Structures are given as C-alpha cells and as structure tokens.
C-alpha cells in the first residue's frame, strides 16, 4: 500500500499532509456511520468575462450541465461500489439523508448521484422505472454550513485582511506577469487577486465543454492560471478565524451526529448522511481538519468521513478523499493532531476550538439584531406611553363642570354622565 508524505504551505508554516492510497471497497465489518460531502458536477460559469459570452451557455449561469449530471450519476455508482452491500439495494429513508445547498446545480447533482447509487430495480405504479429520493435544503441566508457566502462580517473582515497579507503579496509577485497579461486583455487596470477565480472559472468551463478560447489564450497560459487559482484559493481558510467561522459549523454538525449515533440517540437504522455542496465546502472542511491540499476540489469529487465501531465500543474516525473526477483513486488522510487510530473523543477534543459557541455572535450579526430588537421595543414602549397619555387627557376632558339640574342635582353632578359611562 502506497504511503505518501506531501509538504504543503498551511496556516503557520509547513504542514505535513500524510495520506495513503486505499481500496475502493469499504471495511463494512466495523463501519457504523458515514458522512460524505461532494462537489456538484460540471457547471456553466458563475459570472462572465465578456457579456456576449452568454450565448455560449443556454442553460444560464452557474447551472449544472448535462456532462455534470452524468459525472454525478457516475459518482453515485462509485459510492454504490464502496457502500452498496452495506446500504442495500433500495433507498431507506430511516438510514439515509441527503442535504443540499440551495442551488439548482447542487440539488440536481444530488438527484443524479442518488440515481446512480440507488437505481430502480422494479417499476413503480404506471410502469415507471424510477426510485424517487428526497433531497432536503434550507434557504441560503440561514445555511451557515453549506452556503459559502453566508453573511458573516467577522469572516469577511478577516478575508479582506488576507488579500493584504504577506502570503498574498508573495502570490502577486510570483504571478506578476500573468496578472499584468490579464489586466491588459480584460481591460482591468487594477487587477486584484480576488478576480482570478472568475478568469479561471470561465476558461475552465470553456475547456470542459469544448468551447473555443479567445485567440490570446492557450494551454500553457491556462496551466499558469490553474496554478494561480489554486494558490489564491488557499487564502480562503488560511487563519483559525476563517476555519472556525467557515468550516467549523459543518465539522461541528458532523461531530455531534457521530456522537448521537454512538450514544444511540440517532437510531439503529441511521447510516449515511450526504451533503451536496461546493468546492469551498470541501476545502473548508479539510482545512479545519488540518489538511491543506494543494489542488482545489474538482467537479463530482467527494470527501468521506467514516465512523467505525470496534469490539470494545471505541469509535474510530477515518477520512477519505476521492479527489479526481471519474477516476477510481481513493486516498485516506492521517488527521494532524489525532493519533492513528483517531478516536471520536480525541477528534472532538482536538477540534472543538473550531466549533463556534454562538456563530451569529462571533460573526458580529447578533449586535445588529439586538440593536433592531431594542429599537422595536423602544418604539412599542413610547407608543404605549403616548396612547395612555392620550387616553388620560381624553378622560379628563370628559370630566364635566358640575351644575344643578331642575334643582334636583347638586353641584357635584356631572354634565354628561358619571364614571360608569366611561
């Protein structure tokens, strides 16, 4: 079995990422629960370099292509090879749960993946060869686990600082010629590192879909763009703050679900939880685990985090990565700081520093909410006081000057009635 040691630049110097190639078939004798996170399949560009390029993409921007759906279907077949005998031939709603970010491309990727993992064996009513499988999602603004742009002012400030960091300046110097080249070709006088993803994204999408590049583009230039993109992408989760606020929420959810399974509160049947998400989701999760891989996650690749139960009830955590599209190669990481074998308890102890106690508060969101809440309460209090004052004044106006009527009433009788009429 091949053991590899890769030296990569991480958050604080050199990080040794240790991994080994492993067989595709899982060890189902001890396997108890699996979390998988995959990136959606091939898609159209999220943004365009040139407005006229929209005609190249009839599906629209940021949408799953037919090729992407096929990639996910094949990934589902690959997962079936690894877990099929353990999961069974038919989808079991008590054993399997699929969650997606709220994008067409990830929702459709999940459906295509499940079609590959659980192909229909028998026709349903009406003779349809179809096995419908539910895919769950939540709205983007509330999805702090899978939505890469969930509002978090603290993380945004931290990321802005990264663009000015020594590491970022080193990238600018290393790729000065490429940045100058694209600044000229795209008419961008102040070419920023953060714009490189859009350049890579468009060129890569065109390459994947056999669309002709502009005349000034060629394979050797693209190779440098690819290198530039991968180095810039490593800035995204370069600090503990970014890992805690961008990757920690998902890792914490995964850890607590493992703990619930181990304690029995998740139920005996629960086996498999899948997240249909993005390259940034996988990258954030890996970085939070302490793994700084030098190539950004590709289309229809997946991370597998397994929990194994030993005879003595000890739970072990193993992390696998299928990091190539449509290639069977699977690697297993050694988790930095968590001795091999890595127990669930040790993993939690090592990584709890990345579990936000109050994500909204740490992001600086609760201050705004509390301010709005106080304003609303203040308005209600002022309105109530004003209303009571007006009622009191009105009541006083109705206290009538007293005078005698037909000699039968004395000076204390009200003009329009007594207090019972109020």
Curated annotation (Swiss-Prot):
Positions bearing carbohydrate: 104, 210, 218, 312, 323
Active site residues of this protein: 40 (nucleophile), 279 (proton donor)
Residue stretches spanning the membrane: none
SUPFAM superfamilies associated with the record: Phosphoglycerate mutase-like
Signal peptide: 1-13
Pfam families cross-referenced by the UniProt entry: His_Phos_2
InterPro entries for the chain: Acid_Pase_AS (IPR033379), His_Pase_clade-2 (IPR000560), His_PPase_superfam (IPR029033), Histidine_acid_phosphatase (IPR050645)
Superkingdom field: Eukaryota
PROSITE patterns noted in UniProt: HIS_ACID_PHOSPHAT_1, HIS_ACID_PHOSPHAT_2
Listed GO MF terms: acid phosphatase activity; phosphatase activity
Protein name: Putative acid phosphatase 5
Gene name linked to the record: pho-5
């Amino acid at each position: 079995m091949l053991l590899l040691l890769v030296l990569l630049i991480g958050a604080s110097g050199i990080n040794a990422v240790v991994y080994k190639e492993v067989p595709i078939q899982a060890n189902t004798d001890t396997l108890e629960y699996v979390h998988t996170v995959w990136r959606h399949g091939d898609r159209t560009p999220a943004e365009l370099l040139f407005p006229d390029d929209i005609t190249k993409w009839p599906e629209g921007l940021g949408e799953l292509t037919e090729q992407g759906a096929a990639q996910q279907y094949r990934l589902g077949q690959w997962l079936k090879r690894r877990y099929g005998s353990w999961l069974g031939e038919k989808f079991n709603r008590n054993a399997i749960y699929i969650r997606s970010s709220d994008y067409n491309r990830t929702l459709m990727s999940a459906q295509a993946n499940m079609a590959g993992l659980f192909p229909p064996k028998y026709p349903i009513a009406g003779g349809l060869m179809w096995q419908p499988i539910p895919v769950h999602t939540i709205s983007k603004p509330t999805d702090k686990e899978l939505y890469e742009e969930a509002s978090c002012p603290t993380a945004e400030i931290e990321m802005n600082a990264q663009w000015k960091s020594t590491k970022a300046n080193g990238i600018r110097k290393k790729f000065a010629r490429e940045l100058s080249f694209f600044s000229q070709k795209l008419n961008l006088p102040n070419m920023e590192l953060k714009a490189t993803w859009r350049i890579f994204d468009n060129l890569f999408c065109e390459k994947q879909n056999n669309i002709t590049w502009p005349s000034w583009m060629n394979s050797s230039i693209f190779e440098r763009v690819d290198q530039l993109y991968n180095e810039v992408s490593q800035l995204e989760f370069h600090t503990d703050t970014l890992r805690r606020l961008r990757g920690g929420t998902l890792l914490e959810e995964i850890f607590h679900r493992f703990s619930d399974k181990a304690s029995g509160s998740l139920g005996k049947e629960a086996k498999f939880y899948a997240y249909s998400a993005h390259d940034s989701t996988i990258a954030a999760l890996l970085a939070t685990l302490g793994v700084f891989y030098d190539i950004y996650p590709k289309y229809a690749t997946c991370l597998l985090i397994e929990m194994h139960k030993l005879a003595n009830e000890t739970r072990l955590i193993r992390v696998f990565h299928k990091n190539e599209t449509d290639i069977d190669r699977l690697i297993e990481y050694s988790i930095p700081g968590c001795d091999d074998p890595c127990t669930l308890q040790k993993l939690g102890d090592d990584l709890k520093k990345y579990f936000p106690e109050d994500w909204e508060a740490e992001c600086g969101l609760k201050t705004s909410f509390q301010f709005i809440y106080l304003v609303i309460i203040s308005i209600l209090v002022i309105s109530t006081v004003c209303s009571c004052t007006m009622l009191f004044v009105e009541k006083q106006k109705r206290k009538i000057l007293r005078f005698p009527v037909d000699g039968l009433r004395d000076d204390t009788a009200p003009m329009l009635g007594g207090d019972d009429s109020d």
